[in-house]
């Protein structure tokens, strides 16, 4: 199974270009409380099986976590469920922060 991946520089480029995609932070509530990528929606990993009908079919779904490991597995799970437009953010929010890109606080 081939998991599609992009790096943080590519994600930043797509954000700046206004590309049409959805970005999900699949970390825990406690992790997300410390910051989230701009424009991301929080969807805790354990809830993914219950949200299958919510994933768009017509645009890329980019998933990330802390390091890219959990989101890689989540992308694999989605592929197994027949959702082929899931993309993993390699390196996760750690790589994003190391590159000096902005992190937002979660809107209350």
Predicted regions and their residues:
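Rhodanese-like catalytic fold shared by cysteine-dependent sulfurtransferases
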Residues: 1-22, 28-60, 69-108
